[in-house]
């Protein structure tokens, strides 16, 4: 047998990650195409649209789709960037190529994971977060947001999904003076999406103005439009120091959760955070998944590991997906 880096990570090489991984994550192996029939059987009975954000694996879109479909046995994928370009900046040929690749692997798109409104709020003090510009090969200032929204609507139609992910501007030390105006902008965008029968998903993001369950609930209450929903990210909330489950989740209107991102996090003694494989951090994913299932959530449950402890995005995502599937099993959910 030829021992590759991936095989070593799936076996004894995982011991080197012990400092950051729980027993669940340490058990993680890798998926192979030989296991595809069993994986597909689980996918067909899964109550969620189990997915992965494509660029968490690789910028090679063909390879990412092959891994998602054949190795992970999934039917869904979330689109953010590929070929070192944000999905919102793909040209016509690249869009056509992407659609052909998706069709070849029989993958459906959960949503367009766009960078919409991940910028500074005009007129407010410049956010400390704005220097990071972590937008996955995209950088649109405030003046470009309306045009970006139209592009996202077009992409949703192209990829036959009804959901677009957005944010609510880089986090301010004191967003209160601007909150009403920010909400108005979000509502305006949601109503534009509604005209095309699309759902606008606000992600709670630690670098933006809505990060926790409490903040998410407040925005959802302020914007009652039914097609304005939450992309609930417990890992992001935990990174800011809150307890996403059960505390944050308890505050959320369950019928307004339209997507969920899966990642895990470790809080360090200096109160900073670092990412972990799913099941290897402080998020109570067993409880969270059970609650989502109990409350009738049946939309995208998408792995966005961010963790890179296995050396490469692909290897890290394989371990984190294995952790997610083991966590689903522990939660009594067949996927």
Give, region by region, the residue ranges found by the protein language model:
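Glycine-rich, aromatic-flanked loop segments that form ligand/cofactor-binding clefts
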Residues: 106-122
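A cross-domain feature marking catalytic cores of carbohydrate-active enzymes
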Residues: 52-56, 79-83, 111-116, 166-168, ...
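Histidine-acidic metal/acid-base catalytic patches
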Residues: 2-23, 33-37, 43-51, 58-75, ...
